[in-house]
Amino acid sequence: MNEFLAPTAILLITTTTAFAGSFTFPADEPAATVEIPDDWQPTETDYGIEGNSPDAGTYISFDIACAEDMDQVMTDVFAFLEENGVTADPASQKESTDQLNGMSFQTIDWKGTDKDGPVSIGVGIIGLSDEKIAIVTYWASTETEAENLPEVGKILATLQPAE
């Protein structure tokens, strides 16, 4: 789903919106910062931060893991999606590699379904450092995805390693 990477390009031609401020996460061992608008109701999680678009059609989360924990992280991501009724169509899987703010950004995308109907699903793996990665989990209703993509791009563009 190149639509997951497209927000980064869209960001370059869009204006800035009001952000809630910068979230540094995880709280106990900061590894990254990201800005999420207030109306996305950002909340901290055990390993990061998450938010939902105002129309509840798009979910995005950022979690931190050690590079050697990648297999467990991916298992946890799929367990989370399953717990939330999100099912990916394996035949629709697409992978891509790009750069985001100078960091390697690998995405795996699928089409799928949730309790409300068709969705787009994305998992992004961003290399913050040799030891730490950020995992971006994304799912969006196909009905509202295009409307929320510009904001997703702006959120992604704020992701940086913590100083």
How should each PLM-predicted stretch be described?
Residues 44, 81-88, 156-163:
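Sec/Tat-exported extracytoplasmic proteins
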Residues 29-30, 67-70, 119, 145-152:
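Solvent-exposed, acidic/flexible segments
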Residues 29-78:
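Secretory pathway targeting signatures of secreted, lumenal, and periplasmic proteins
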Residues 1-8:
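Bacterial N-terminal signal peptides that target proteins for export
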Residues 61, 107, 135-137:
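Structural recognition of the beta-strand scaffold that forms the well-ordered cores
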Residues 16-20:
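Sec/Tat signal peptide C-region and signal peptidase I cleavage site
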Residues 38-40, 134-163:
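Surface-exposed amphipathic alpha-helical segments
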Residues 82-129:
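Signature of long, low-cysteine stretches enriched in small and polar/charged residues
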